[in-house]
From Swiss-Prot:
Keywords: Cytolysis, Formylation, Virulence. It holds the Pfam family PSMalpha. Belongs to the phenol-soluble modulin alpha peptides family. The keyword Hydrolase does not apply. Induction: Up-regulated by agr. GO terms for biological process: killing of cells of another organism. InterPro entries: PSM_alpha. Transmembrane segments: none annotated. The gene is psmA1. Peptide which can recruit, activate and subsequently lyse human neutrophils, thus eliminating the main cellular defense against infection. Stimulates the secretion of the chemotactic factor interleukin-8 (IL-8). The ensuing activation process triggers an inflammatory response in the host, thus contributing greatly to virulence. Also possesses hemolytic activity, which may contribute to the development of disease. The keyword Iron does not apply. The modification N-formylmethionine is found at M1. Peptide production is higher in most prevalent community-associated MRSA strains than in hospital-associated MRSA strains. This is Phenol-soluble modulin alpha 1 peptide.
Amino acid sequence: MGIIAGIIKVIKSLIEQFTGK
């Protein structure tokens, strides 16, 4: 669960960077 949650967090961060750009 921890690994999956970490991956989701990273993906969300990348999406925010692209959309926030």
